[in-house]
Amino acid sequence: MVAPQSVPARVATIGVHDWDLDCFLAALGELEHPVVVDVRQRRGVRGPQYAWANSQRLQRALAAAGIPYRHVRNLAPTTELRQLQYAADDAAGVGKRSRQTLDPGYLAGYIEHILDRFDLSELLASLPDDVTPVLLCVEAQPGACHRSLIAGRLASEHGLDVVHLCP
């Protein structure tokens, strides 16, 4: 008989904005056995101060720190959903980096078209035992990013505690 896969005790989230690489890695290092789960559609970040967060550089830095990485594109918002959020940001007069919350239309669309169609149980089962998955995206504030929706679903459906790592 095969032992059942254990479920992580918690999930963490982290954005890229407002971190530098050293502080980002230090924050991850405070977690027990972190595994970065990149949920970005486009794994590049604009601005020279965030060059470290572009996919290949980030993967090299994580590997050097002994932190596993995986990209789960199916949890990323579609281009259409991202455009919907950008339009809401423009209408509210807020920039992407200063956004505090997600637009209700974006929320509904992300939940219906992405989150409800994704098997989070399968994601959890694919992770090694005793790890802390760390959902990675761009926004500094978790409430301004879809990663908080994923973390919330993991909490409500799988009993994981949620830790938001913020700069």
What do the PLM-derived regions correspond to, one by one?
Residues M1-P167:
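Residues lining hydrophobic/aromatic ligand-binding pockets adjacent to catalytic sites
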